[in-house]
Amino acid sequence: MNPAIDLNCDMGESYGAWRMGNDEAVLQFVTSANIACGFHGGDPSTMRQTVAAALAHGVALGAHPSLPDLAGFGRRAMQITPQEAYDLVVYQVGALAGVAASQGARLHHVKAHGALYNMAAKDAALARAICQAVRDVDSDLVLYGLAGSALIDAARAIGLRAAQEVFADRTYQADGQLTPRSQPDAMITDLDQAIAQVLGMVRDGSVRTPDGQTVALQADTLCIHGDQPDALVFARGIRLALERDGIAIQAA
């Protein structure tokens, strides 16, 4: 049986007059959309428009909750309690669920954004709070989390379905964590390098670190960042490479 992978992309991150990403073009190549819920991007009109566009392309709807950090685009870590994390996720997932319901649709998944995602990947208490929030809003939702991280463990512990996420445009460290964006080798900007990494993760269940180590991981869903300059080129090229390799592409 050939392997399968979900292609997800962060979307709806524009805010007011400030525009981010090329959502409409990227939607034709992905199977899941992680839609910002107002705390790092995504005003109410953008949320509505992004849900409508995703539905028009048959793309699964996901909430993309963040720390309350519009100025920093949700990428700055801050100290929060598990209860605060729970409240943030319930509030944001509930908001997008309402937008989806107004268009006759339901959410499929939840993926935390930026610093909240990275913090919860390592912090078991935050991970448990996020997963509990997701389950309390809708126990049928899928939790997207960094492959092999505390988020995946927390979801499984409470019976929440989890999809292990890997990245096309980020390098990995020996512990399976993403290389911090502050480091010079964090981002992969060459499409051929990204494709090679993706195929290795999906087919072989492993990824090589910048210093040559091999790290095992499971790939259920692949993130393509919509805010990178070549997002459309990456989305098209990676999808074509997966299809040529006989890998099925479907929502997680």
From Swiss-Prot:
Reactions that this protein is recorded to catalyse: 5-oxo-L-proline + ATP + 2 H2O = L-glutamate + ADP + phosphate + H(+)
Superkingdom as given in the UniProt entry: Bacteria
InterPro entries: Glyco_hydro/deAcase_b/a-brl, LamB/YcsF/PxpA-like
EC number(s) on file: 3.5.2.9
UniProt GO molecular function: 5-oxoprolinase (ATP-hydrolyzing) activity; ATP binding
Pfam families in the cross-refs: LamB_YcsF
Biological process according to GO: carbohydrate metabolic process
Keywords recorded for this protein, A-Z: ATP-binding, Hydrolase, Nucleotide-binding
Entry-linked PANTHER family: 5-OXOPROLINASE SUBUNIT A, UNCHARACTERIZED PROTEIN YBGL-RELATED
Subunit structure: Forms a complex composed of PxpA, PxpB and PxpC.
Family: Belongs to the LamB/PxpA family.
Its biological purpose: Catalyzes the cleavage of 5-oxoproline to form L-glutamate coupled to the hydrolysis of ATP to ADP and inorganic phosphate.
Protein name, per record: 5-oxoprolinase subunit A
Protein species of origin: Bordetella pertussis (strain Tohama I / ATCC BAA-589 / NCTC 13251)
